[in-house]
Amino acid sequence: MAKAKLRILYGEGDGDVLAKQAQAFEKAGHVVEKVEGRKAAEEALKKSAFDLVILGSTLSRNDRHHLPYMVKKANSETSVLVMHADGSRHPYVDACTDTGVSMESVLNRIETMKIAGMMPQVAAAGAGR
């Protein structure tokens, strides 16, 4: 089965980090909307639906805490990945990685998540039997 192409909202507090790391998600075949800061992330959530929201380590701790609530309020099926260990304690965070892990590790973590955007491919594969 081919890898699922996900629609990702990726937020960081630092524009340089955002641009550099978003390239890795795009190179893996995902469609990425990049946002810098909490307000931009909230606006994007109001305008579009996403399979996965990734909250980067350069967002403030307060933003990484507040945004998962906003994601689930916008769409309870959207998965949330926090690129910081403090995400493990949050009830609305589906997965987290340690700060500073390689992008390959982050991409591997995404592949192990049960993301709603991946499910239609699995269902379609099962229907063809």
PLM features: residue spans?
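Conserved phosphotransfer microenvironments
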Residues: 54-73
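Conserved phosphotransfer cores of two-component systems
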Residues: 46-48, 71-78, 86
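Structural motif
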Residues: 11-15, 55-58, 83-85, 99
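Conserved acidic segment of CheY-like receiver
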Residues: 5-15, 21-25, 53
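Acidic, metal-coordinating helix/loop segments flanking the phosphotransfer/catalytic sites
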Residues: 34-52
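Short, flexible coil/linker segments at domain boundaries that flank nucleotide/cofactor-interacting
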Residues: 1-6, 75
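A generic structural motif
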Residues: 28-32
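Output/docking surface of receiver
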Residues: 81-129
